Each structure stands twice: as structure tokens, then as C-alpha cells.
Design a protein with these regions (language model features):
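The feature represents the membrane-entry module of six-transmembrane cation channels
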Residues: 1-153
């Protein structure tokens, strides 16, 4: 299969895709935290998980319907790609117009961020080896290019 390396990393949850349904349910002033904080939220089991399971994510790539969105943008601060939350609000508007996108790759939330413990660093390294496949997948993904927020221009 064309995207087999990507499917393996998703199945193993080295990369965890964000569930669009969860993203759209977030209030307007919500800010996307690091993956580590989202996993704590997931373990608290307060309803809909922010993440797809590894099997759910792999199935979206395998079905060839381009249901995974991959964000492309520059980080506004070295430690925070979206300090004002403006990118999340823009992404929510885009996703409402593109109901076929079921999951999102957003590096801040889907890859482990510093500081990382050893197992997180190992997962991050494996994810980096195939991360560009998310942007280059001919079958599984759609790229979403977010502009620089007005307040930062």
C-alpha cells in the first residue's frame, strides 16, 4: 500500500489525529494544548475523545477518501503555534465548510511536544520519520494552509 509507513505510525499512535467532531465542539476561546495535556483530558473520559484511536486513524488513510486534513502553517511563537486561538477559530470555520474531513493532523496536538519523557521522545522520532507522508499522501490526506493571523501580521 502507498501509505503503509504512515498507517503503521498511526496504528501505533506515534501520531494521534484530532477528531474533527471534537474540534468543532470546542468553545470560541479554546486554545489547543500540547498532545500530553490532551491525553490527560482523554483519560479523564469527559465525553468525546479529542483523538481518534490508531485503528480509526489508519482506516481513514486506507479508505482513500482524503478524510484526513493536514495543517500547514508557521508557528507564531517557539512554544505556541496559536497563542491567540485565532487559527483554531479559522480552522473550525474551514471544517464546517468541509464536512468530509473527519480528522486533523495539527503538530502541536498530535505529536509529543517538549519537554518529552523517553517514550514520548521515541514516539516523536518515529513520527518525524514519516510526518511528511501526511502532506504528500496521494490518497489519504487533504492539506489545509492557514494564513498568518491578522493580529500577528
Amino acid at each position: 500500500m502507498l501509505d503503509e509507513r504512515l498507517v503503521t505510525v498511526l496504528t501505533n499512535e506515534d501520531i494521534r489525529l484530532l477528531r474533527v467532531e471534537w474540534l468543532l465542539a470546542q468553545r470560541e476561546d479554546y486554545k489547543i494544548p500540547r498532545r500530553q495535556e490532551l491525553e490527560i483530558l482523554e483519560r479523564a473520559d469527559q465525553g468525546l475523545s479529542p483523538f481518534l484511536t490508531g485503528e480509526e486513524a489508519a482506516a481513514l488513510i486506507r479508505n482513500g477518501a482524503r478524510e484526513v486534513g493536514t495543517l500547514s502553517y508557521g508557528w507564531l511563537l517557539p512554544w505556541d503555534p496559536d497563542p491567540t486561538g485565532e487559527r483554531l477559530r479559522l480552522l473550525q470555520r474551514v471544517l464546517k465548510q468541509r464536512p468530509g474531513i473527519k480528522a486533523i493532523f495539527w503538530d502541536q496536538a498530535t505529536l509529543y511536544q517538549p519537554p518529552r519523557i523517553d517514550r514520548e521522545q521515541a514516539a516523536f522520532d518515529r513520527a518525524l520519520d514519516v510526518m511528511m507522508d501526511l502532506y504528500a499522501s496521494a490518497l489519504g490526506t487533504t492539506c489545509v494552509l492557514l494564513p498568518k493571523p491578522q493580529r500577528c501580521s
